Amino acid sequence: MDYSLLPTFNAILNASSGILVLLGYRNIKRSNESVHKRFMLSAMGVSAIFFASYLIYHWEVGSVKFQGSGLIRTFYFTLLISHTILAVTIVPMVLRTAYLALKGNFAKHRKIAKFTFPIWIYVSITGVIIYLMLYQL
């Protein structure tokens, strides 16, 4: 199997997840709870597909070495470290935030979502930036 297209596919999934989260946020700000729920559950589904595809790619291909040097290399690894830590952190946060909403505990849902939302957006954006730096520079 040719795995060469998976990094681009993963970046598209990552960007799509971030866009869905932003659309979900916009709809909850407009008090459109049912549309918010659909966007957020869609974002979770896209993120799950991303994660499976990401694992398959790295299982089959291994790690890819960043080719840049100097300040761009420092920037890349700083971004990668923050992205990786927050990507691991966001998974239980998203699951907890969704669980609270699905159980109807909206006070706690809103409280944790204030942290979950910006981290999820950061991870989506930095994931795409890392892809561009690693595969397109």
Region roles according to the model:
Residues 1-137:
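Alpha-helical membrane insertion/targeting regions
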